[in-house]
Amino acid sequence: MCTHTEPSRSFYAELQALERGAVTSLSFTPGFPAADFPECGPLVFGYGTDAGQLSRGVDALYERVVLNERDWSIEFLSASEAVVEAMRLSRAGGRPVVIADTQDNPGAGAASNSTGLIHALVAHRAQRAAVGLFWDPQAVNVAHEAGTGASVELVLGAASGHPFAGRFVVESLSTGRCHCDGPMLKGATVELGLTTCLRIDDVRIVVTSTRVQMMDRAFYRVAGVVPEEMKILVNKSSVHFRADFEPIAQAVLVAKSDGHMAADPADLPWTALGNGMRVSPGGRPFENTKRATDSASRCA
């Protein structure tokens, strides 16, 4: 969930409006789902000099979260659905449609080498599409040995369990050193390692030898891809890319394709949550059977 989108945007606006007088600070932490411990979950808290006013502010925010709980669910599209919708939107021309390949986000611990969206782009014959950043050092080495303009047979994502095999054109080669101008990295120089742009049909894949999530348009440009000229951009990231890409995007879609970081917390193998904590907005409550068994054993 991004704070730029609803319901986060209006919720945090209300939170800021309540920070007045004796209420020094209010906070809402939705909870980082890749953390399996009893206290994991959303929390509203605050600091102030008047306990009554502070409690009213915290209670108001808590009630808003609970009453509108299901609004915090994210609509995920399958890889095929996301590509079809992006192609439909892009027919109007203008700015690119961005697809977040959220479950293959290396910033959350994924491998950045899943091919579900590449399969979908090629299958649906997407035009002027680009994917980044795809981590495959072996493919990068083959491309650099073959040279720019060469045609190479490759199996991308061989270690992912769902590889993509095909003949690619090596469109560009790079050292992967790039200067970033976006608001996330603010002028930093980033080393992506040896990098290449591989094209199959009209789909371009920026492949790197270092695992980095897509968060700056410079990560495309270093491989010769101009993101503003693409119809579809598939970013292996969840939220960090938005600061630099939303200004050029006509829409941002979130795809639930193959990848190692479950985007829906209900899909995670919880073991240690507090009893009764719902595993997703409006979802089933967690029941810690192990803790109940341990307690029964101690009582016995």
What name fits each language-model region?
Residues 44, 66, 182-300:
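Extended hydrophobic packing segments that form well-structured cores
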